[in-house]
Amino acid sequence: MMKLRVSEAPFPGAPVMVMIAGLGGLGGYWLAQQSALSRDYQVVVYDQRGTGDNADTLPEGYTLADMAQELHRALLIHGVHRYAVLGHALGGLVGLELALAFPEAVSALVIVNGWLSLSAWTRRCFEARERLLLDSGPAAYIAAQPLFLYPPSWAQENQPRLEAEEALHNAHFQGTENLLRRLWALKNADYRERAARVITPVQIICARDDMLVPWTCSQALHEALPHSRLDVMDFGGHACNVTAPQPFHSLLYAGLASLAPAPHKETV
């Protein structure tokens, strides 16, 4: 069974927020958001299948729909039947799969730096990273990750953090075969024919300076979804929730309030 980390509910009847990381797959990506959201939500984070605490060998042909099915089953086992989703890139697209397959379960969806279909630019970035992984190995692949995730000015000011992250990712690397299969799943996800069927209210957050996924991809996704709002950050890069947490949280809370107002603990 997939392992989930489920926080205590902050008050009786608190809504559930499921956080889904991107290609790296580790729930620790959401550390800053866990702290912020745990005041109003029962928070669920997890390491995706084939990564971290959920080590496994992924099958050939593994898809984002498979990822969504696995997560939904694990949530049901934990007694979670209705939840909001906060997903980054791959995680946001897994959220779309959940909204399409289980519309009665997903109360709201927030997609951070996601897309409707893979852009030529993002495909070029992925293919370059794949070649780096295959030709030079995992250490070189991991060393290059910050180039795609962070604005240069932020990275320059956070060198000790980048070095610590690099050491952590090397120690917990998901494996070349797993990573390639997750990349295959991500590159082949396409919602152009299905987006109009999403009835879940969606907030889309993107960063104008994202070097991996052009912000216009979020704009195209917004235009294709029937019930969505688009919030664009001027700074933050692909990992904008990490590099600019306060502006990100302000947009996130405003969006969540408009999509699905959270019940608050009664005061006497």
Curated annotation (Swiss-Prot):
Keywords: Hydrolase. GO terms for molecular function: hydrolase activity, acting on carbon-nitrogen (but not peptide) bonds, in linear amides. Its EC number is 3.5.1.-. It comes from the Bacteria. One of its GO terms (cellular component) is membrane. One of its GO terms (biological process) is nitrogen utilization. Residues 15-119 form the AB hydrolase-1 domain. Belongs to the AB hydrolase superfamily. Hydrolase RutD family. Involved in pyrimidine catabolism. May facilitate the hydrolysis of carbamate, a reaction that can also occur spontaneously. This is Putative carbamate hydrolase RutD. It comes from Cronobacter sakazakii (strain ATCC BAA-894). The gene is rutD.
